[in-house]
């Protein structure tokens, strides 16, 4: 399940490739077009180098970059679907692979900020999953909070795929939501700089362990004249151990074999540490069937729209003004 056996398609399961795409320096729409061409070229090259690969993943911001002075401008935004996603779809169809791509998506409501979106395209060239980032990296990211929930789709080798984006992976409830809906391979695409490198590794492992699912995570790599992006693609087993760990190299291709049926079997056969089941059946030895209400106050309050921390009134940062964003809501940064 490590790199030495990851050149061809396994007999069961599938081979995944996560691309540590160099952080793009983007100043114009031509730069975005160049990135798209580079991503498509990389997808075909990866398939040629790893003929058995069935899923190729590109990190957050690989299409449009992180030019914070322009990332909200109409010039930099794309539509989903649109001609750019059609180009990705054609590439997946030609290479006969599933692909995961990052798009900063124009909001259909012109009075609201754009979405940070991920899509999965199948080998027939169809968008089979569209996810809008639920938890933007506040206060620095200006994206509108996602409205599509946490979708799950069928993938290669018996997998059920879900995608989270960067900071989403720090929210354990979101990984649990994906697993609760059947996901057994949780993908994380990110554009993190080195400040949270350790936490990235930790949460990729914990998301796998808490939910008995594989995690496949990949980050941008390289320097954009402001920050260094750490790469470090990571594939974690459903028991929370790291199967493959990338380095900090731009263009590194992190590959690994995934066996979704093994995760499925663990969910069916494990007693001890089957925590996703135990959450809703606590104490099932003493009480047949267990207690179904976990009695967790924050879950009840969140569901009722009353979530509030004991220290919330005293928090210093609760809007984007520290980064110069307006606090009145509505569309800004055009």
Curated annotation (Swiss-Prot):
Key words, A-Z: Hydrolase
Mention one GO molecular function.
Answer: formamidase activity
**Gene3D superfamilies, per database record:** Carbon-nitrogen hydrolase (3.60.110.10)
> What's its EC?
3.5.1.49
Q: Does the keyword Hydrolase apply?
A: yes
Picking any one GO biological process from the record gives: putrescine biosynthetic process from arginine
Per the Swiss-Prot or TrEMBL record, the active site comprises 60 (proton acceptor), 133 (proton donor), 166 (nucleophile)
What function does the entry list? Is an aliphatic amidase with a restricted substrate specificity, as it only hydrolyzes formamide.
Recorded protein name is Formamidase
Q: Which organism is it from?
A: Helicobacter pylori (strain P12)
Per the record, the gene is: amiF
């Amino acid at each position: 399940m490590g790199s030495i056996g990851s050149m061809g398609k396994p007999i069961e399961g599938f081979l995944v490739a996560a691309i540590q795409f160099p952080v793009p320096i983007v100043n114009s729409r031509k730069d975005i077009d160049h990135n798209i061409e580079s991503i498509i070229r990389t997808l075909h090259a990866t398939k040629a180098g790893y003929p058995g690969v069935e899923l190729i993943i590109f990190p957050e911001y690989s299409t449009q970059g992180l030019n914070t002075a322009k990332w909200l401008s109409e010039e930099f935004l794309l539509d989903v679907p649109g001609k750019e996603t059609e180009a990705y779809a054609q590439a997946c169809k030609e290479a006969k692979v599933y692909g995961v791509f990052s798009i900063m998506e124009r909001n259909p409501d012109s009075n609201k900020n754009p979405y940070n979106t991920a899509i999965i395209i199948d080998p027939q060239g169809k968008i089979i999953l569209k996810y809008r980032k639920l938890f933007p990296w506040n206060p620095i990211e200006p994206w509108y909070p996602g409205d599509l929930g946490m979708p799950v789709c069928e993938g290669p080798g018996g997998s059920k795929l879900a995608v989270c984006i960067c900071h989403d992976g720090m929210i354990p409830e979101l990984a649990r939501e994906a697993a609760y809906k059947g996901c057994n391979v949780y993908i994380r695409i990110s554009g993190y700089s080195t400040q949270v490198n350790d936490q990235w590794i930790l949460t990729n492992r914990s998301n796998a362990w808490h939910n008995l699912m594989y995690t496949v995570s990949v980050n941008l790599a390289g320097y954009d004249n402001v920050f260094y992006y750490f790469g470090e693609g990571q594939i974690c087993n459903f028991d929370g151990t790291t199967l493959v760990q990338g380095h900090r190299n731009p263009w590194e291709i992190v590959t690994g074999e995934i066996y979704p049926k093994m995760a499925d079997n663990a969910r069916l056969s494990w007693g001890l540490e089957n925590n996703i089941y135990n959450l809703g059946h606590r104490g099932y030895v003493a009480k047949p069937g267990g207690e179904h209400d976990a009695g967790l106050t924050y879950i009840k309050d969140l569901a009722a729209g009353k979530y509030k921390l004991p220290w919330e009134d005293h928090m210093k940062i609760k809007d984007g003004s520290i980064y110069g964003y307006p606090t009145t809501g509505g569309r800004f940064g055009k």
